[in-house]
Curated annotation (Swiss-Prot):
Membrane topology: Multi-pass membrane protein
UniProt lineage: Bacteria, Pseudomonadati, Pseudomonadota, Alphaproteobacteria, Rickettsiales
Example of a GO cellular component annotation carried by this entry: plasma membrane
Molecular function via GO: cytochrome-c oxidase activity; heme binding
Protein origin, superkingdom: Bacteria
Signal peptide boundaries: none
GO biological process: aerobic respiration
Designated name of the protein: Uncharacterized protein RP382
Places the protein is found: Cell membrane
Family stated for the protein in its record: To A.aeolicus AQ_155.
Keywords attached to this entry: Cell membrane, Membrane, Transmembrane, Transmembrane helix
Organism from which the protein derives: Rickettsia prowazekii (strain Madrid E)
């Protein structure tokens, strides 16, 4: 039964991971348009400037919202014990009723595999939605295209993920809330459900207001997604902490000494996220204090948990004893010298650790850079997206680490000569190069955005007047963006080729 559960979980997790990779790839294609239109020398290639905002909206939704939530859904499916029997502790006295409940539970597990397919269809609707019209609404967190195709796609994705979360929660093992995995799964599911509570609360409040006074569509969507969008950022942070600690545990090859501390951080971030509900309780949605509450909430509480996590990780590494280092060295030497089966290629563990170290370094660097830039925000200009790009791409690279960690064990299995050509593309050096390229490009892109914002270039407007002094910075931003796109698409290519096309690597449902 346990192996069957594990097969269920791995297959389900990979389905969501595939969706995340697809959405990231599609978002990367749209980002090419954004970079070209933001680069003075290249913007003349696009005569219709409305394409910029449409591309921006689709890019944000595909490469942030759907990508990060797909990784979150993958974590739910991969790490949760999906029980194929009735709930523990429920007494069912009648045999027929017991059979019905058992059959229903099996059926629920089968239904879980429908959700990634529905989400994939929703993602395609979002990707092609610009064909239905360019009526753009550039509100924060979940920017909108006001056409039926986009709204259907976004609604389908949200409802699908909500139903999936409720199903996972139904099958959740409530007796094991003392480990990192289950706390992450439980807390992020509750946070995601609460984000829908916020969306519903905001919608109800706005419906009452528009009956009295008209509201501009951009202001409407800004308020509709403001509270729930803030809560989504805390979900991303929760997943970030989980992945950072998981990657650290992989490279240290031992149980972490500060396990309880990391659990405390996850619970702390969870409690901070729940405080978001007080914005709706304390303020009217039309009141300016409503938006300020969430801005201050993010400003003062959003970075506490990840910073504490980084402190714990640094102390963990510093306090690693010489004995542990010696054991680690012996372990790596033993894996390096182990025999390789005939006609097979095996990726050694020490190289896997090298990739994970690279991912951790790049993720932490970009996340901290985004935090430092946030200190300099004092106007509505390009400093704001510079901060957000740093933080969110730092989280995104951590999610890439989760993806690589999922794929690499498959590559460690026996891979025969017939697939050797694929391994050239999937080699460790290419993986590390993709991550470094993405990070370097993003640093250039972020710094170009930040300094352009300091010189007064406004956000969300490709036609804003660009001072001569910031032309070079905008060019740096464009070049950095293109470099980052290449790195990101390399990631999509490597992971996509492994998960979709490499024979012998599929996890079949048993």
């Amino acid at each position: 039964m346990h192996s069957t559960n594990k097969s269920h979980n791995n297959s389900l997790a990979n389905a969501w991971l595939k969706l995340g990779i697809i959405s990231l790839g599609l978002g990367g294609l749209y980002s090419i348009i954004l970079v070209v239109l933001r680069t003075p020398q290249l913007s003349s290639f696009f005569l219709n400037q409305r394409i910029f905002k449409s591309a921006l909206i689709i890019h944000v939704n595909l490469s942030i919202l759907i990508w990060l939530l797909s990784i979150t859904a993958s974590v739910w499916g991969n790490e949760t014990s999906l029980r194929l029997v009735k709930r523990r502790g429920i007494f069912i006295p009648f045999g027929l009723l017991r059979e019905i409940v058992t059959f229903y539970t099996f059926d629920r597990n089968d239904v879980l595999y429908i959700y990634p397919k529905l989400a994939f269809f929703a993602t395609l609707l979002i990707a092609i939605s610009p064909l239905a019209g360019y009526n753009t609404v550039t509100n924060n967190y979940i920017p909108m295209l006001a056409n039926i195709v986009f709204i259907l796609g976004l609604s389908l994705f949200g409802v699908t993920l909500l139903l999936y979360a409720i199903n996972i929660l139904y099958l959740f093992d409530w007796m094991k809330l003392n480990n990192l995995v289950n706390v992450t799964v439980f807390s992020t599911i509750i946070m995601f459900i609460l984000s829908f509570v916020c969306f519903g609360w905001s919608y109800k409040s706005l419906q009452k207001i528009i009956q009295i006074i008209p509201i501009e569509i951009e202001f409407y969507y800004e308020l509709l997604f403001w509270s729930g969008g803030h809560l989504l950022q805390f979900i991303y942070t929760q997943i970030l902490i989980f992945i950072w600690v998981s990657l650290l545990r992989t490279i240290t090859v031992r149980e972490l000494k500060f396990q309880t501390f990391y659990l405390f951080i996850l619970y702390l971030n969870f409690v901070f996220s729940i405080l978001i509900l007080f914005g709706h309780i304390s303020y009217d949605i039309i009141d300016i204090a409503f938006k300020e509450f969430y801005t201050d909430h993010m400003k003062y509480l959003g970075g506490i948990a990840p910073i504490l996590c980084l402190v714990g990780m640094v102390v963990e590494l510093v306090l690693m004893s010489y004995r542990d280092k010696l054991v680690l060295l012996i372990y790596r030497l033993s894996t390096k010298s182990s025999k390789i089966k005939k006609d097979c290629i095996t990726l050694s563990n020490h190289r896997t650790h090298s990739i994970i170290k690279t991912i951790l370094l790049c993720s932490i660097t970009l996340f901290l850079l985004g935090g430092l830039i946030a200190i300099n925000i004092n106007d509505i200009n390009l400093v704001i997206p510079a901060h957000y790009h740093g933080s969110i791409v730092g989280i995104s690279i951590a999610c890439m680490g989760y993806s690589y960690q999922t794929i690499i064990p498959l590559m460690d299995h026996d891979i025969h000569k017939t697939t050797k050509q694929y391994l050239i593309t999937l080699s460790i050096n290419w993986i590390k190069f993709a991550i470094y390229l993405l990070t370097f490009g993003q640093i250039l892109h972020i710094l170009g955005l930040a300094f352009s914002g300091i010189y007064g270039v406004m956000r969300k407007d490709p036609n804003s007047i660009v001072p001569m002094s910031s032309k070079l910075l905008m060019g740096m931003m464009g070049i950095g963006g293109l470099i980052a796109i290449v790195g990101g698409l390399m990631f999509v290519y490597i992971c996509g080729k492994t998960m979709f096309f490499l024979k012998g690597m599929k996890l079949e449902y048993e």
